[in-house]
C-alpha cells in the first residue's frame, strides 16, 4: 500500500495546521523542569484506559497537587471530579514520586529506548504505551502511542498482536515505524495524524 498517497489529503489539509501547532507545543516543553515533567507524567498515568480529555481535566484541576497531596487527598479529589479510577491511580502517582528528580535526565538521554525502559520499570502504572505517550508529550517523537484508536487503524491493514506484553507492543510498533519511515515522518508525529483521522480531534 502506498501510504504517501493514502495520507496526502491529511498531510495537506487542515489537520496539518492543528498537528504542527501541537508538535511545536511539545517541542517547547521545558525538559529541565522536573515538577512540570512529573505533572505531565501524572497526566499519562491518568489517561491510561480512559479518555485523554478526562485526564487533561484532572491535570488542570490538580496541577502541582500531584507533587505533594497525600494518596487519600488525591483519591478524594479524583472521586469528586468523577474520574473513573479514583481508587487505584492515586497510589500510582504517590509511589512514582521517587522518580521526580531523575526525570530531566531520563527525558534527555541519547538512548531513547533506554529512557522508555527506565520509565516502564520505575513509574507505577506505566507500560510501553504510557511511557511513549509521556515522552511524546515532552518532545520525544521516536515512538508510537499504540492506544485503541491507533491499533484499530493498524489492524485494518496488518495483522497485529492483541495483548500488551512488551514483545507484542514492540512488534506492533515495528510495523508502525515502517509506515512512518515510508512517509518520512517520526512515529510520534504520524501517531497524531492517525489519532486525528480516527477521532476528529487532537488533545495530547
UniProtKB/Swiss-Prot annotation:
Active site positions: 129, 147
Instruction: State its Enzyme Commission number(s).
Output: 3.2.2.-, 4.2.99.18
| CDD domains registered for this protein in UniProt | ENDO3c
Per the UniProt entry, how does temperature affect activity? Answer: Optimum temperature is 60 degrees Celsius.
Name the reaction it catalyses.
Answer: 2'-deoxyribonucleotide-(2'-deoxyribose 5'-phosphate)-2'-deoxyribonucleotide-DNA = a 3'-end 2'-deoxyribonucleotide-(2,3-dehydro-2,3-deoxyribose 5'-phosphate)-DNA + a 5'-end 5'-phospho-2'-deoxyribonucleoside-DNA + H(+)
* GO molecular function annotations of the record: class I DNA-(apurinic or apyrimidinic site) endonuclease activity; hydrolase activity, hydrolyzing N-glycosyl compounds
A single GO BP term for this record reads: base-excision repair
Print the keywords alphabetically. DNA damage, DNA repair, Glycosidase, Hydrolase, Lyase, Multifunctional enzyme
Q: What does this protein do?
A: Catalyzes the excision of an oxidatively damaged form of guanine (7,8-dihydro-8-oxoguanine = 8-oxoG) from DNA. Also cleaves the DNA backbone at apurinic/apyrimidinic sites (AP sites). Prefers oligomers containing 8-oxoG:C, 8-oxoG:T and 8-oxoG:G base pairs, and is less effective on oligomers containing 8-oxoG:A mispairs.
Tell me its family.
Belongs to the type-2 OGG1 family.
- According to UniProt, the name of this protein is 8-oxoguanine DNA glycosylase/AP lyase
Its gene is ogg
